[in-house]
Swiss-Prot record:
GO terms for molecular function: brassinosteroid sulfotransferase activity. Expressed in roots. Coiled coil: none annotated. One of its GO terms (cellular component) is cytoplasm. It comes from Arabidopsis thaliana. It is found in: Cytoplasm. This is Cytosolic sulfotransferase 10. Signal peptide: none annotated. The lineage of its organism: Eukaryota, Viridiplantae, Streptophyta, Embryophyta, Tracheophyta. It comes from the Eukaryota. Belongs to the sulfotransferase 1 family.
């Protein structure tokens, strides 16, 4: 990726919130989350004020193309890994997996794949999308989102594209959120606890939550339209990475050829995108963005890490809630 292609200053065309947006926000019920921030309930989900400003911008300005790929996830669910894997897959004809100048060796995955509601449409309905697009017109546009499927239905109604959702066990998500918040420059660890995060998740009052409704929106999408929706589990990616990466490639219409498989391309992608390799990239060790150290995106990535932190009472409570919320859906964690 050339320097000019880096996704800098994606919020150049800043627009103030419309009066309609201000009126909407003032009319919504709100709660205080575990960080003391005000979250507003809009059509069943909890959003911060800035995300609420981005939703109408996405509705009016985002025009999906059939070749677009949207990577969706609840935060701290494997987003960074999915971005790296997807970029390496769809760009492997342009960027050799053995190239020392591969973009993933010089840029954080979040720089390469911008977030719709935060990087692009937060302050504008007409962001400059050329800031991150590949110079190859045949390459798909890659976007990410932490929103549920529901607010995306408006732009997707006109032109549906490929959507990949990665879901992670909510107990591991909570622990990961806890540690990630400690890395934020504006957050003091003593200001909140795992117990506070746990209660917010149980009550459903978390940014983009409730967690189960978020996951179910994409789960149902994958059942109704498997051509356009792929539902992936973080735990499956960890347990069977080769199988899952090949599944992802098939879904994205860029399957591995026999020659690629014989030459070890699958393993090369997994190595390039591995937690240990990405963690060792210089920019991921030293760069800070939005008051977050890039290194904080690469902690453990373990499955079942929650067992070291949650009490039996916490586990019983969240398991009962999960069983109730997912009952009859076919979705299991």
């Amino acid at each position: 990726m050339d320097e000019k292609d880096r996704p800098k200053n994606l919020r150049e065309e800043e627009e103030k919130p419309s009066e309609e947006t201000k009126i909407l926000i003032s009319s919504l019920p709100w709660e205080i989350d575990y960080l003391g921030n005000k979250l507003f309930n809009y059509e069943g989900y909890w959003y911060s004020e800035d995300i609420l400003q981005s939703i109408p911008n996405i509705h009016t300005g985002f025009q999906p193309q059939e070749t677009d790929i949207i990577l969706a996830s609840f935060y701290k669910s494997g987003t960074t890994w999915l971005k790296a894997l997807t970029f390496a897959l769809v760009q492997r004809s342009k960027h050799s997996l053995e190239d020392h100048q591969h973009p993933l060796l010089h840029h954080n995955p979040h720089e390469i794949v911008p977030n719709l509601e935060l990087d692009l449409y937060l302050k504008s309905s007409k962001p400059d999308l050329t800031k991150f697009l590949s110079s190859s017109s045949s390459s798909p546009r890659l976007f990410s989102t932490h929103m549920s499927l529901d607010p995306l239905q408006v732009p997707l109604k006109e032109n549906l594209c490929k959507i990949v959702y990665v879901c992670r066990n909510v107990k591991d998500v909570m622990v990961s959120v806890w540690y990630f918040r400690q890395s934020k420059k504006i957050t003091r660890a003593e200001d909140y606890s795992l117990e506070a995060i746990f209660e917010s998740f149980c009550n459903g009052v978390t940014l983009h939550g409730p967690f189960w409704d978020h996951a179910l929106s994409y789960w149902r999408g994958s059942l109704e339209d498997p051509k356009h929706f792929l539902f992936m589990r973080y735990e499956d990616l960890k347990a069977e990475p080769r199988t899952q990466v090949k599944r992802l490639a098939e879904f994205l219409d860029c399957p591995f050829t026999k020659e690629e498989e014989d030459s070890g391309s699958v393993d090369k992608i997994l190595e390039l995108c591995s937690l240990s390799n990405l963690r060792s990239v210089e920019i991921n060790k030293t760069r800070t963005s939005s008051r977050v150290d890039f290194k904080s995106y690469f902690r453990k990535g373990q499955v079942g890490d929650w067992k070291s932190y949650m009490t039996p009472e916490m586990v019983d409570k969240i398991d009962m809630i999960i069983e109730e919320k997912l009952k009859g859906s076919g979705l299991k964690f």
